[in-house]
Amino acid sequence: MSFSSDVRNELARIIPEKECCRKAELAALLAISGDLVVGEDGRRILKVQADNAATARKIITLLKENYQIPSTFKALEQKRFKRKRIYEVNVLLDGEDEALNKELEEILLLREKETTPVLNRSLLGRTCCKRAYLRGIFLSRGSINRPEGEYHLELVLNDSRMALAVQKMLDKFALEPGLVERKNYLVVYLKESEKIVDFLRVVEASRALLNFENVRIIKSVRNNVNRQVNCETANLSKTIDASLRQIELIKRLLEEQGLEILPGNLRDLAEMRMSYTDASLKELGDLLDPPLSKSGVAYRMRKLEESVKEILQED
């Protein structure tokens, strides 16, 4: 099962306690995934599709808790896409209860001859309702990469008004989403791991958030270890190259002039380098008498190399 499916299954099981939040989330689910059709008897039916059974069951639950509206539920085979099955909830909008019909129309802002519901912004006055609405948006049109891979979360919308509204709403939570057009859709997306974590916190996907954070921490530690190893490897390579260069110079001096030509402090360092070819500068400094700091050894080693080069050039 994908990480997106895990998140959706978790969100599908969250039923808001407040009626205002239930209405906001239901309105998002109906507005994003719903299409209006006219039945044979002339009455309007709202067909809402979901890509998993848990989301479909949530739509039915919210309809029942808010409006006591009966709805039908069925599974459909969808062969054109990778997922083999989708779920459809059918809601009769022109029932016998006129007051209920009117309330549904107001929530969805249904207009004559329109086939797509539009969200009523008056439902989003409170922060808790915005959270519920974004939860409904993700359930309908959201996806998120596994935290082990590249960080990416997106909400795919087919209505420009809805996309801009979602982008502004995410901005209210300081998530700073991007917006890009992809074929016939508008995609609101997040690519920073911190922003994705914040989004999961906003929609109250606590279990997914914990899993995401655990993987993110492990990745961060692993990356830090890799950087440290690479840095140490590079430093070791530099140390080996410098040691080989120094030993080669000292060998040439031994063959052509001898070490006695060097000043005492440089001669001691040259002899120490030849005796301990694998030692680092710090280790050489500890072996000298009196001991010398790493920076002191580095300075003296540069003087040694310069002196040897001058002597060999004069010869």
From Swiss-Prot:
Record function comment: Involved in cell division and chromosome segregation.
GO MF annotations, alphabetized: DNA binding
Originating gene: whiA
InterPro entries membership: Homing_endonucl, Sporu_reg_WhiA_N_dom, Sporulation_regulator_WhiA, Sporulation_regulator_WhiA_C, WhiA_LAGLIDADG_dom
Pfam family, one: WhiA_N
Protein name (record): Probable cell division protein WhiA
Signal sequence interval, chain numbering: none
Coiled-coil region(s): none
Any Gene Ontology biological process: cell division
Top-level taxon of the source organism: Bacteria
Keyword presence, Cell division: yes
Family: Belongs to the WhiA family.
Keyword entries, A-Z: Cell cycle, Cell division, DNA-binding
DNA-binding region extent: 280-313
